[in-house]
């Protein structure tokens, strides 16, 4: 494997698009970045280039939603040809829309099908094929249910890496948002899974809010995936390389990161992109700092205006007190 899963940013629908990933990559060279989940149907039949990304994003993984082995193999092959570093199968998303398409968390109940999907993808690509799943679904939440799933998908499908969202999913009655918050976290179950499947690479996801917490999990597991916290307080990514990968590079200041976004933004604007689609990912950069609210407000109120450019960010940056060396 050419990249590490030691720390990754979770695939998050409507959030981890290519603009977001470019922004995150400015802060960390080592963190593995994931696309939003993209369905096989969108890639095979949709209009538009759903696989577009920037070369600077590497290492970057494509997360696929689907349950047809042949379609998944087709998409995995396209991803590998485009240079993605990993393909990940979504077996964790609980939304009704996803279930109706017969993919996501409901696939936990069909481990042989998941194994077939993984095997079909592995047959056509040399890059890692991984699975992101939950610890259970509905009332099927025993440890045995999880170990049966991992056994079948690893032995029959050849999957060597699993990211475990340490909550079960309720397939009805809870919204996707509630499914990320209401089912209790069970980290020890993921730790036990690593003990029982020591030959597999096991990463954890769910509720991780700091690099200190990530370090604690890394005492027991191979990797940690951070979701909402990395999006809402993205500056935590700025010290990942130093804290978790031993980098000697200086940690970038927030102002430097904003300024490093300017050339990218100008290039994207020239290609017809909309400023707000890029700046929305940057709103949390000054989280909990003096001037943070003014920074967010100025961007939110101005980025959507016709003809807006990097001057919106320059003006927003001026709202942060100059004496702060941030």
From Swiss-Prot:
Keywords: Flavoprotein, FMN, NADP, Oxidoreductase, RNA-binding, tRNA processing, tRNA-binding. The record marks 90, 177, 180, 293, 296 as: Interacts with tRNA. FMN binds at residues 11-13, 63, 132, 165, 205-207, 227-228. PROSITE patterns: UPF0034. It comes from the Bacteria. Its EC number is 1.3.1.-, 1.3.1.91. Its cofactor is FMN. The active site is at residue 93. GO terms for molecular function: flavin adenine dinucleotide binding; FMN binding; tRNA binding; tRNA-dihydrouridine20 synthase activity; tRNA-dihydrouridine20a synthase activity. Transmembrane segments: none annotated. Belongs to the Dus family. DusA subfamily. HAMAP family: DusA_subfam (MF_02041). Catalyzes the synthesis of 5,6-dihydrouridine (D), a modified base found in the D-loop of most tRNAs, via the reduction of the C5-C6 double bond in target uridines. Specifically modifies U20 and U20a in tRNAs. PANTHER family: FMN-LINKED OXIDOREDUCTASES SUPERFAMILY PROTEIN (PTHR42907:SF1). This is tRNA-dihydrouridine(20/20a) synthase.
